[in-house]
Swiss-Prot record:
HAMAP family in the cross-refs: HisB
Molecular function per GO: imidazoleglycerol-phosphate dehydratase activity
Cell compartments where the protein resides: Cytoplasm
Gene3D superfamilies associated with the record: Imidazole glycerol phosphate dehydratase, domain 1
Taxonomic lineage from the root: Bacteria, Pseudomonadati, Pseudomonadota, Betaproteobacteria, Burkholderiales
A single GO BP: L-histidine biosynthetic process
Catalytic activity, EC: 4.2.1.19
Keywords: Amino-acid biosynthesis, Cytoplasm, Histidine biosynthesis, Lyase
Gene name of this polypeptide: hisB
Pathway involvement of the protein, from the record: Amino-acid biosynthesis; L-histidine biosynthesis; L-histidine from 5-phospho-alpha-D-ribose 1-diphosphate: step 6/9
Single GO cellular component term: cytoplasm
Protein name: Imidazoleglycerol-phosphate dehydratase
Family listed: Belongs to the imidazoleglycerol-phosphate dehydratase family.
Signal sequence region: none
């Protein structure tokens, strides 16, 4: 089982993330940011990753630090659970629709953090959630999971649907990229021999 637990405490947030990359999509998520909890649930369910996330942050200011730091801590946990990437498929991609919305997500566990983020949200907030924090979450995640991530919302006019298709597609692309290919044995999926 590829599992990891990360505890990250700062002056702004206190976060614990436990992951099982070979799970079934079970989750226990409490970040204090309800819309983020809903989106993290999509990652767990569609990625078949067991997630146990507890966060306490300075929500009296706003959700920025909490959302970003959950992304950072989740990225750290994914990187730790994946380990040296021996036998890893490395690449993953998914298209996910939800009614009128359609998003594409592509992942490379390259060891080189990079985010290409293309979502033109149709409104600034989804309930109380500032949609700008979606980018902050993924930027924190890719920086610490050491992945290249391309996110494209191809269409949609309902901002909730736009966000949900992105998180569902991320979960499905993650599931594909982090699978172990038994034909590779212990080989690292790079001509360099290291990622």
């Amino acid at each position: 089982m590829r599992t990891a637990e990360i505890i990250r405490n700062t002056n702004e947030t206190r976060i614990r993330v436990a992951v099982n990359l070979d799970g079934t999509g079970k989750q226990s998520i409490d970040t204090g940011v309800p819309f983020l909890d809903h989106m993290l649930d999509q990652i767990a369910r569609h990625g078949l990753v067991d997630l146990d996330i507890k966060a306490e942050g300075d929500l009296h200011i706003d959700a920025h630090h909490t959302v970003e730091d959950v992304g950072i801590t989740l990225g750290m946990a994914i990187a730790k659970a994946i380990g040296n990437k021996a036998g890893l498929r490395r690449y993953g991609h998914a298209y996910v629709p939800l009614d009128e919305a359609l998003s594409r997500v592509v992942i490379d566990f390259s060891g080189r953090p990079g985010l290409e983020y293309h979502i033109d949200f149709t409104r600034a907030r989804i309930g109380d959630f500032d949609v700008d924090l979606t980018r902050e979450f993924f930027q924190g995640l890719v920086n610490h999971a050491l992945m290249t991530l391309h996110i494209d919302n191809l269409r949609g006019f309902n901002a909730h649907h736009q966000a949900e298709t992105v998180f569902k597609a991320f979960g499905r692309a993650l599931r594909m990229a982090m699978e172990v290919d038994p034909r590779m044995g212990d080989a690292i999926p790079s001509t360099k021999g290291v990622l």
